[in-house]
Amino acid sequence: FGEGPKILPVLDPTEKDDWGENIHPHLPAIGGFGGGSLTLIIGAVKTGKSTLLSNLFLNDDMYGQDQFDYVKIMSNTISNDITSRFLKEAYDVDDYYSDDIIRGIIEEQKKYEKKDQPKIAILADDLLGSVGRNALLWQLCSRYRHYNIRMLAISSQNFRQVSPVARQNCQNLIITSPFPNFKEMRKISEEFGDVVGGEKNFLAIYKYATPERYDFLHMDLQSNPVKCYKNFDILIAEGQKLYFDPNSIDLSEFSGKNQVIGVANTEDM
């Protein structure tokens, strides 16, 4: 038989889709054919999650109000959160979760040919106490791109309450500060540490990204290697390559004693 058959690349569609190319590369990527992001935002109360979400969906330097054809927000707390009042004014909002809401969005999108489907966003904000294990939201986490959902954002105070399906399909991870729950942070570091060279590297990256209250770590898991940012501003790590000295970071709050990190390649920024 000679040489074996070779895998040929699949050609990109001939028509150009430049929607989303205007988005800053430090933000979760939502453009391209079949593109989109499942973004998890994890943080305690009063750590700036509402401000972050308001900026993402209202600030013209981010996605703004004109990026998506439709935005659906489900939030148990939005009616009582003064920070989110402009989101409530701008978008279609329910202060509860229901599978019927998700089902209705899916059925509406299925009315269109794929190329004609509206480009939409769904935000599920602090709903996990009312979202069951078999909820349609979790099923959507592995299929959202089929319905041209370009942004599926899920915010939670408790990482371990987020379905494994959502965690496995997460494209972008944002962790706010301060993060007082030691066990939660260790769980996150165990789950995502390998992509940056281990748990200790992950904790050092988080600490370096969040020196002040309301700072956050953004991990772009769509990139290869994974890119880590301080807020949406500064690239601080790519995979195991850290652009700071991890040995200078005090990790005592996570371990009860300082840990030496010796597995990263460091490079001055």
Predicted regions and their residues:
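Intrinsically disordered, low-structural-confidence terminal and linker regions
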Residues: 1-5, 267-269
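P-loop NTPase motor core of the ASCE superfamily
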Residues: 27-46, 52, 65-66, 118-119, ...
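Short, flexible N-terminal segments of the mature chain
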Residues: 94-98, 237-240
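Conserved P-loop NTPase motor cores
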Residues: 39-60, 65-66, 76-80, 95-197
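Short, aromatic/basic amphipathic alpha-helical patches
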Residues: 82-91
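Short, mixed-charge, low-aromatic patches
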Residues: 6-13, 141-144
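An amphipathic, basic-hydrophobic helix/alpha-beta surface used to engage anionic
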Residues: 71
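Pre-Walker A adenine-sensing motif
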Residues: 10-33
